[in-house]
């Protein structure tokens, strides 16, 4: 059976991410959710926080592991003997970047395939950026993230507000 990796920043982990994990985990023997360090993106949550959040949401999937990584995806995929990289495509605008990335990954890892999954209809518009922005303005994000993630957001926003005062 095949091992797949689903890499991302997951800042924060949304219902759309979980939707892709649920569907991909039914296809593969093992799915490794790779939480990327992504320091260049200046994530809202630390790597450790994003790993903990993803583990809280995905803890009931027996064939899913959550692992943090930094460096090249090709090295992460090799380290975990992955044969497939799972990527989500929310909109046509995602396709060009993801297509180029898949080509580069195929060049670097000729024996690893990229599988694109589109989210279920109700999750196509969700992005971590939108969720963070709505939450930071006191909006309701309960339809976009799980209750545990919403608690993390509220706590982090409150902590950041106190630090700015």
Swiss-Prot record:
Keywords on record: ATP-binding, Coenzyme A biosynthesis, Cytoplasm, Magnesium, Nucleotide-binding, Nucleotidyltransferase, Transferase
Gene3D superfamilies: HUPs
Coiled coil regions in record: none
Biological processes annotated in GO: coenzyme A biosynthetic process
Catalytic activity: (R)-4'-phosphopantetheine + ATP + H(+) = 3'-dephospho-CoA + diphosphate
Pathway listed: Cofactor biosynthesis; coenzyme A biosynthesis; CoA from (R)-pantothenate: step 4/5
Residues reported to bind ATP: 9-10, 17, 88-90, 98, 123-129
Keyword Nucleotidyltransferase carried by entry: yes
InterPro entries, per database record: Cyt_trans-like, PPAT, Rossmann-like_a/b/a_fold
Enzyme class per UniProt: transferase
Positions of substrate binding: 9, 41, 73, 87
Compartments, record wording: Cytoplasm
Site, Transition state stabilizer: residue positions: 17
Entry GO MF terms: ATP binding; pantetheine-phosphate adenylyltransferase activity
Requisite cofactors: Mg(2+)
GO cellular component, one term: cytoplasm
EC number(s) reported in the record: 2.7.7.3
Family: Belongs to the bacterial CoaD family.
Function as written in the Swiss-Prot or TrEMBL entry: Reversibly transfers an adenylyl group from ATP to 4'-phosphopantetheine, yielding dephospho-CoA (dPCoA) and pyrophosphate.
Subunit structure: Homohexamer.
The protein's name in its UniProt record: Phosphopantetheine adenylyltransferase
Organism of provenance: Polynucleobacter necessarius subsp. necessarius (strain STIR1)
Gene that encodes it: coaD
